């Protein structure tokens, strides 16, 4: 059963990221209080768009192929999240704070809701954040490009090969769909220097 509805950007269906529907798959939420259907959308809106949180900026740079030395403006951050969908695999709070790990029961229970979400969102690319998550994924249709990256909050995270794999998956999806993307995967029209703390 799905508890946390996915974030679906306003341009996910019409334009996507570089003309491709990209679903970013996180691992889990942590928190206290009541789990609600809108929790994921509230988190992405607050920390991906309205405020600046390194975790969400790292995801944007990873998925959009943006250089680590590039400062992403507030407008660019907001625009990115309108182009993609985001969903957390585990459908329960794992604990009251970060680094609380899902239980085996949580991992197993998450598959049906994830497959229903895939059927609903029809992504062309799924970007899986976290190598451990890879071990628990159910079979995903072969028509979907699936790529993996270390979790952006993991110690010593580097964009390196993960970024390249994601960009290749987006390119393959765009070409196999029979259409070329209208815009590059990198949504930045202009760049500026990186600012401290990001």
Name these PLM-found stretches.
Residues 97-115, 133-198:
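C-terminal capping/extension of enzyme domains
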Residues 123, 131-134:
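An amphipathic alpha-helical core segment
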């Amino acid at each position: 059963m799905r508890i946390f509805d996915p974030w679906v950007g306003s341009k996910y269906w019409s334009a996507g990221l570089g003309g491709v529907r990209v679903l970013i798959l996180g691992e889990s939420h942590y928190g206290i209080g009541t789990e609600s259907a809108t929790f994921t959308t509230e988190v992405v809106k607050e920390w991906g768009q309205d405020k600046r949180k390194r975790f969400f900026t790292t995801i944007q740079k990873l998925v959009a192929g943006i250089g680590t030395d590039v400062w992403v403006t507030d407008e660019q951050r907001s625009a990115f999240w309108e182009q993609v969908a985001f969903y957390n695999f585990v459908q329960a709070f794992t604990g009251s704070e970060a680094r609380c790990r899902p239980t085996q029961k949580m991992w197993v229970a998450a598959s049906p809701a994830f497959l229903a979400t895939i059927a609903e969102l029809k992504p062309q690319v799924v970007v899986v954040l976290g190598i451990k998550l890879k071990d628990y994924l159910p079979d995903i249709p072969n028509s979907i490009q699936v790529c993996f990256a270390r979790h952006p909050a993991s110690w010593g995270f580097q964009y390196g090969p993960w970024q390249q794999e994601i960009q290749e998956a987006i390119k393959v999806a765009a070409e196999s769909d029979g259409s070329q993307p209208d815009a590059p995967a990198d949504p930045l029209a202009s760049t500026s220097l990186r600012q401290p703390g990001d």
